[in-house]
């Protein structure tokens, strides 16, 4: 993984009301590196979505510093920072402004004054990256939830941001739609097209990331690669998170005498080892 620092957050504090005792963000510091997939996880009210909004300048912290791609985030620089970051939100139906997929992906480019020929090239390129090139003339309401989110991602990457933030972008999708979106994210990351930050309460999704930050009570609770974070096990359950099914099943099988090499973070890894064990019997 590239270790060029893309985002630096230093000791930020945020309250939704200035007179509130509770801090939605309470002294949070973190770094995001170019080319990585970072998952920020936590239960409802942990501060993870507030942090996403702070990174994009939708809210400004009352103290502390945020720097994005070398730009200090302030009221004056917020629009410059937003050119570096694209966001995909929770409800795909709230994100469409065009009457067709083509119009929707082109909308942000038109607003930014991109020349028509370049805009056509960017739209065609973006929809191919998310495998939606066969739906360019479809009306958005005819698409499935997963397809809608893939179109939303196409609209983001057409603008060529350095960073994509997925704010609970899979939480309203069925399992098929969720997997479609996560496969799209994996493809974008592997092709080096963007740094990805996914905000989620779903540890099955977070297990696919390079690194996880766990939020709790507005503070950073833990940080590390997925295999290290899941060793916290009961601590994660205690703060309101559900361990991935594959991890729980791996634990149960090992406790009952099956010689698995590890507690698997993904179903694919668990199935692969079970097949290997079966072939040796």
Curated annotation (Swiss-Prot):
Pfam families with a match to the protein in the record: ABC_tran
Superkingdom of the source species: Bacteria
Active-site residues, record numbering mapped to chain: 168 (proton acceptor)
Principal EC category: translocase
Subcellular localization(s) per the UniProt record: Cell membrane
GO cellular component, one term: ATP-binding cassette (ABC) transporter complex
PROSITE patterns to which the protein is assigned, alphabetical: ABC_TRANSPORTER_1, ABC_TRANSPORTER_2, CBIO
Topology in membrane: Peripheral membrane protein
Assembly and interaction partners: Forms a stable energy-coupling factor (ECF) transporter complex composed of 2 membrane-embedded substrate-binding proteins (S component), 2 ATP-binding proteins (A component) and 2 transmembrane proteins (T component).
Protein name in UniProt: Energy-coupling factor transporter ATP-binding protein EcfA1
Gene: ecfA
